[in-house]
């Protein structure tokens, strides 16, 4: 019996395992309405403009579900913020919401998020379980991207189309 346990233990310790883990491609945005001070622009309450959103890259899963990392889909986006706005890009977050309210693969978080900021651009990437190409749903949906400040004021949306490449 003790040899059985020893051999079983050795087998489990020597089994090759693959794991997949992505660091989030975004950070939480902390709203603080009770500590927020409204900013003025030429004597008028400053509004949040529509961000300029660019789809940098869409990567589809290439392996069967359960494969390590290769079944993940990724969407890389950039949001450019106007330098002329009274709110700095460090003071705002962004909501990503499917235009019809239904995110087909739960790609985007339900809360406002911040991206990795460089100059006046925030970079994001979103990961979802995409699976083998044989079983993938076609990507073709619209996403509204809203800026939000710490007082939970929401700006005008930019609408982008997430669509898989043709051919």
Located regions from the model:
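Signal that preferentially marks extracellular ectodomain short beta-strand elements
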Residues: 121-135
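Solvent-exposed loop/turn segments flanking beta-strands in beta-repeat/beta-sandwich domains
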Residues: 80-109
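Extracellular fibronectin type III
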Residues: 151-165
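Short, compositionally biased P/S/T/A/G/V-rich stretches that sit at domain boundaries
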Residues: 20-81, 166-167
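Exposed beta-strand face motif in extracellular beta-rich ectodomains
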Residues: 137-143
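Sec-dependent N-terminal signal peptides
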Residues: 4-13
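Solvent-exposed serine/threonine-rich low-complexity stretches and specific carbohydrate-binding patches
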Residues: 104-120, 160-161
């Amino acid at each position: 019996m003790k040899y059985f346990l020893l051999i079983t233990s050795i087998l489990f310790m020597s089994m090759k395992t693959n794991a997949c883990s992505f660091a989030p491609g975004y950070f939480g945005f902390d709203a603080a309405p009770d500590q927020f001070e409204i900013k003025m622009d030429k004597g008028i309450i400053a509004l949040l403009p529509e961000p300029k959103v660019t789809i940098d890259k869409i990567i589809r899963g290439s392996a069967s579900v359960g494969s390590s990392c290769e079944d993940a889909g990724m969407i890389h986006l950039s949001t450019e913020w106007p330098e002329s706005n009274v709110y700095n890009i460090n003071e705002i977050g962004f909501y990503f919401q499917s235009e019809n309210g239904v995110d087909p693969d739960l790609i985007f978080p339900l809360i406002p998020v911040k991206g990795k900021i460089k100059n006046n651009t925030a970079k994001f990437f979103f990961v979802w379980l995409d699976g083998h190409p044989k079983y993938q749903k076609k990507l073709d949906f619209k996403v509204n991207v809203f800026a939000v400040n710490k007082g939970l004021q929401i700006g005008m949306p930019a609408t982008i189309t997430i669509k898989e490449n043709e051919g």
